[in-house]
């Protein structure tokens, strides 16, 4: 009825059909399942930093070179760090939390934060909401810890750095840390 070649082909077709049907059945069984992964940390600090504040990207936008020359600076963009679940009490014999300091760090260019990329002649200046200029690596003045949640507001401005200006894309990474006392 079937030649040896046709018998082998027919047998292979039957086996593959069985595998495909089994895979379809297995896929139907698994569709009702899922997985949730999580992570977190327990910290010994007065406040936690809100998830949306830990890793931010600020779009400084595209501006004409002439605007920096005319205005003496580029655009200013606001950003903030949200502190959550702040407490004053510490467990055990440790003294209560009272103050904190914020320190920003990154590629320093004098009192400014340097940029990388094709653009030249510019750097970034950061100010806090009290008008204090943020110097890379130097802590800002101490502030009192207030229980609950709190938003720390800052602004970032593109500034000339007294080098020849050159158009191009730029980027920078600025890290921050909080120390509690």
Would you name each region that the model predicts?
Residues 2-7, 12, 22-181:
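Mature extracellular/passenger domains of Gram-negative fimbrial/pilin and adhesin proteins
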Residues 18:
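Short, Gly/Pro- and small/polar-rich lid/capping loops
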